[in-house]
Every structure is written in C-alpha cells, then in structure tokens.
C-alpha cells in the first residue's frame, strides 16, 4: 500500500476528519461496480435458489435492501456525500461449486464525486440481508470478498480490478 497522510482527502492538515469539498469538481458521469459473496451450506443455497426459505424470497428482499442501501449511503458512512443516483442494481449468481451466492451491484450518477461507496454499501447490505434471512437454517454462513471491481469517470479516470479466474 502506497501513499501518505497528505493523500488522505478526508483529513485536514491537523489530521481531523472532514468532508471533502467537491464544489469545484466537474460534473461527469460516474459508475461503480462492486462484488461480494455469501458462503453457505449447499442445502441453504438450494433453498434460496428454489424459493423455499421459510422467511420468503431471499433474493427479492436482498435486492431491494441493496438498492435502498445504495440510496442511503450518505446516512450510513459519515463523510460520504449525498448523491442523486440515476441507477442502482443488485444481481445474484449462485455458485454451487463454491457453495456461495455471488452478489454484484452497479451504481451510476452524474455528479462531482464517485459512487464507489454506494456500490460497496449495496453489496454489503444485500449480503447482510441474505445472512439475516437464512441464519435460522445455516449458522455457518460467511460474508466474504466485498470489493470494488470497477469505477468509471471522475478526475482519477477509470479503474478496473484484475481478478484471476
């Protein structure tokens, strides 16, 4: 990890937390994609996929929870800016070989700051919702690998994580 305290934009010269002033930044299209996964017992994954979980449709509830979380990120993360999102989606891919449910969130806006935190928050809350809805049948679940996959737009430009297959 490289960098110095001078590069931490959420700290002032005295090291105190502050909200970054983005007022002079250009308004540009922004997009971020984040992923994570919930590892579980094979029977739990099957119950989720088949819609047989006692608490209801896990994927539908987790999708809505993730989208709501993206919209409310500024209320959850203290120094995040309130953004006018133009798009937020949360999708799931079962991974039977890994006994996991993969989560991917995509968030977009046109604004003066990026939407990385909104995408990461969407994945995190979707994962926690899955955990909450399934904990009665599987206490071994594990939330894993929440990470930013890509970001587009803004002064720092585009970025893509290189992931091995």
Curated annotation (Swiss-Prot):
Keywords: Lyase, Molybdenum cofactor biosynthesis. Homohexamer; trimer of dimers. It catalyses: (8S)-3',8-cyclo-7,8-dihydroguanosine 5'-triphosphate = cyclic pyranopterin phosphate + diphosphate. The active site is at 132. Gene3D superfamilies: Molybdopterin cofactor biosynthesis C (MoaC) domain (3.30.70.640). The gene is moaC. One of its GO terms (molecular function) is cyclic pyranopterin monophosphate synthase activity. Substrate binds at residues 79-81, 117-118. It comes from the Bacteria. Catalyzes the conversion of (8S)-3',8-cyclo-7,8-dihydroguanosine 5'-triphosphate to cyclic pyranopterin monophosphate (cPMP). GO terms for biological process: Mo-molybdopterin cofactor biosynthetic process. The keyword Lyase applies. This is Cyclic pyranopterin monophosphate synthase. Belongs to the MoaC family. The keyword Lyase applies. Pathway: Cofactor biosynthesis; molybdopterin biosynthesis. Its EC number is 4.6.1.17. NCBIfam families: moaC, PRK09364.1.
């Amino acid at each position: 990890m490289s960098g110095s305290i001078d590069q931490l934009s959420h700290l002032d010269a005295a090291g105190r937390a502050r909200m970054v002033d983005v007022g002079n930044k250009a308004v540009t299209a922004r997009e971020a994609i984040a992923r994570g996964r919930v590892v579980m017992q094979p029977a739990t994954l099957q119950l989720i996929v088949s819609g047989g979980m006692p608490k209801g449709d896990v994927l539908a509830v987790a999708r809505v929870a993730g989208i709501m979380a993206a919209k409310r990120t500024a209320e959850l993360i203290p120094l995040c800016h309130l953004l006018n999102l133009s798009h937020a989606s949360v999708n799931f891919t079962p991974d039977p070989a890994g006994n996991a449910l993969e989560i991917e969130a995509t968030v977009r806006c046109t604004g003066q700051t990026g939407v990385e935190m909104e995408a990461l928050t969407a994945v995190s809350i979707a994962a926690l919702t899955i955990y909450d809805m399934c904990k009665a049948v599987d206490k071994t679940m594990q939330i894993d690998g929440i990470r930013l996959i890509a970001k587009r737009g803004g002064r720092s430009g585009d970025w893509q994580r290189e992931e091995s297959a």
